[in-house]
Amino acid sequence: MKILFLGTPLYASRHLEALLSAGHMVIGVITQPDKPAGRGLRMVHSPVKDLALKNKIPVFESLKDFPFDRLTPDIGIVVAYGGLIKKKFLDLIPFGYYNIHPSLLPKYRGAAPINRALENGEKMTGVSLFKLTEKLDAGPIVLQVEISVDCFETFDSLENRMIEAGKKILCDFLKNPESFELREQDHSQASYAPKITPADLFVDFRKDSEAVKNKIRAYDSRPGARTFFHGEQVKLFGAVAIEKCHSGEPGTIVHIDDKGAYVTTSDGIIVISQIQFPSKKKMSFLSALNGRMLRVKDRFQS
């Protein structure tokens, strides 16, 4: 089958790479336009565009620019494209468009399912392959695979596991798409994972230890959970809840060792392994202590 691939970030490019490695015929790619990045604001290709150009695959920035009458794709594969597909385009491909989504639909429809699942402390999530319709992430399911979430999972580790699962079910599906039955979603069970806002990144140490831990791991390593320290915005990485009792104001550093900073919450203590100060690289709390950048009894603002 001739495949039209729609996707933008590294998450999507790894799925495209799997299709190419399996020998599938990708006749075109739709990806978001180049964006300015870095201090020099140099225009940068998306990871999907980079991979497509490397493999001499035609690249387009929107479906309206794609020559459907000349390239005639049989099926569309969508992975983290970053835009909705209008009905007039849905009808232009014989077999339709199929989307890989990192949640067990109908749960966590929307832009940030991995972050939101971790933030909510989910113990089970997964990957869904479904047929696109006009409504957001609401089309019938083709395949799903469950993925358990352990207490040490971070965004990075869970995303990597999601990618591996997504690559497998996508390649399994494309071996014989006609053999799979579609199953309608139970829309009454739908929940949503809205796009991350800057306010979502901030840690509130007045919450319980589990909530604080989940907030930090949901954005580890990118874009990084935030808090204020002596009026500066800092990022926090790696968190484990260890105690259910303490004394002291939430956000107070009560101890620092090679495991990290022991910080009070509303109901206990959480160990945070790394900190990143503005214009600095990530470092251990012990390094920050030795560099006199912080000390025991300092407090993060909530």
From Swiss-Prot:
Record key words, sorted: Protein biosynthesis, Transferase
EC number of the protein: 2.1.2.9
Annotated positions binding (6S)-5,6,7,8-tetrahydrofolate: 103-106
UniProt xrefs under CDD domains: FMT_core_Met-tRNA-FMT_N, Met_tRNA_FMT_C
Domain of life the protein comes from: Bacteria
CC annotations in GO: cytosol
InterPro entries, per database record: Fmt (IPR005794), Formyl_trans_C (IPR005793), Formyl_transf_N (IPR002376), Formyl_transf_N_sf (IPR036477), Formyl_transferase-like_C_sf (IPR011034), Met-tRNA-FMT_C (IPR044135), Met-tRNA-FMT_N (IPR041711)
Cited Pfam families: Formyl_trans_C, Formyl_trans_N
Catalytic activity: L-methionyl-tRNA(fMet) + (6R)-10-formyltetrahydrofolate = N-formyl-L-methionyl-tRNA(fMet) + (6S)-5,6,7,8-tetrahydrofolate + H(+)
Protein's UniProt keywords contain Transferase: yes
Gene Ontology MF, one: methionyl-tRNA formyltransferase activity
Family to which the UniProt record says this protein belongs: Belongs to the Fmt family.
Protein task: Attaches a formyl group to the free amino group of methionyl-tRNA(fMet). The formyl group appears to play a dual role in the initiator identity of N-formylmethionyl-tRNA by promoting its recognition by IF2 and preventing the misappropriation of this tRNA by the elongation apparatus.
Protein name: Methionyl-tRNA formyltransferase
